[in-house]
Curated annotation (Swiss-Prot):
Keywords: Amidation, Disulfide bond, Ion channel impairing toxin, Neurotoxin, Secreted, Toxin, Voltage-gated sodium channel impairing toxin
Entries under SUPFAM superfamilies matching the protein: Scorpion toxin-like
Molecular function per GO: sodium channel inhibitor activity; toxin activity
Residue numbers of Cysteine amide PTMs: C62
Protein name: Toxin Tst3
GO cellular component: extracellular region
Pro-peptide region(s): 63-64
Source organism: Tityus stigmurus
Role: Alpha toxins bind voltage-independently at site-3 of sodium channels (Nav) and inhibit the inactivation of the activated channels, thereby blocking neuronal transmission.
Superkingdom assignment: Eukaryota
Amino acid sequence: KKDGYPVEYDNCAYICWNYDNAYCDKLCKDKKADSGYCYWAHITCYCYGLPDSEPTKTNGKCKS
């Protein structure tokens, strides 16, 4: 397992407007993570305990 920012197909992290921790927790759990929250500094979801196979944010550009 690993911790990190889950990404969509285009290497873009999931935005959590209004710092919605419940949204991120559900999103992370839907991806088989243990839990998640909205990281306020980046307004993106961060997950704990993601499966190693789940893609996470790298240094590559977001292609949106």
